[in-house]
Amino acid sequence: MVAILGTLGFRANSLLPTFESTPGVDKVVVFCNDHPRALEALTEVRRVCSIMGIQIDRVAVPDAFDLLQAAKAMRQQVRLLKREGHEIAVFNIAGGTKMMSAAALLVCAMEGLNSVYVHDETYREIPLPLLKVDYSQLLTTAQKEILTYIWTNRVKPMTQVDIAQGMGKHKATINHHIQMLEGKNILHLVEDPSDRRRKVVRVDDALELMLEMD
């Protein structure tokens, strides 16, 4: 079973060339929002899929400008297809907003997928060279535990002492790992707005995707 994925904007032609270039396709998963022109393009893609005998699933993207939301939805579909035994031939990232394309590229890098872009004028497919990296494997088990604790308790700003006490770890151990994570630019030590003498740990929203805590 061979599947292809694609982001879809206002033009069906940004996706259709991949149907022709990929042999043995039996399933297509399309990511698009509810803009009337996007739905028109989706109707055309459905028509072509019907003619070619290809099953098509549409995944709605509520906010086409929310990179993390789109990436999480895309990765969920990738995992589902893999569990079902599909070979994912390629991810066409040509359609939709720039944020949707960026989300698709991010997922391709994290999941080890091939990706293509389709030229706006010639409709020629352009394979995209990507380094495929499992970012979570760059972290030690201890670092993952610390980041998970920080993310789970992110509502309240925490110092390194707070983290050590909350996790029942030695402060020196936590300080060492925090320093390493800050060096990797995974978290940041910033001034506490309520007490400028204190440094609190801040993490970005992308950490949720990196640690697969969705």
Task: Locate each region found by the language model.
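Long, low-complexity, Lys/Arg-enriched
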Residues: 1-88, 99-214
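Conformationally flexible catalytic loops at phosphate/diphosphate-handling active centers
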Residues: 91
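Active-site glycine- and acidic-residue-rich loops that bind
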Residues: 94-96
